[in-house]
Amino acid sequence: MSRKNKLKRNRRSITVQFTNPECRVMFNVMECLVSDVYDLGVDIPAIIASVTNSGYEKLKNYNLTDNMPDGIGEFPLTVKEMCGALYSCNWILEDYDDDLLPNSREEISALRDKLDNYLSQILAISSDSV
């Protein structure tokens, strides 16, 4: 069996689903970080700023208020953009006072944990497939 067919056979598909309020938290977090990167010249790696910005731009065009079936919608970001979002959550939780957070600390922490879990699953599946 060719390696390509073997990979195809072993590939398991996983999807991340976020409720609309989680999409809103994600949008707010990314908007906050992108705004600070440009306004304040925050010293974060260029690749993180870039993927956070591209994720933010995608979310600007994603209708966060539409009623999805059962209130669930698939998240429209790439893995790189989700990594940028995870980094954004961590950055904001560590460096911002509560009164400057775009959402509550609990909401941002819950989103960070969900992103971390999702990206860990992707890593595990990628490792299994090689």
Task: List each language-model region with its residue ranges.
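Positively charged, low-complexity terminal tracts
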Residues: 1-130
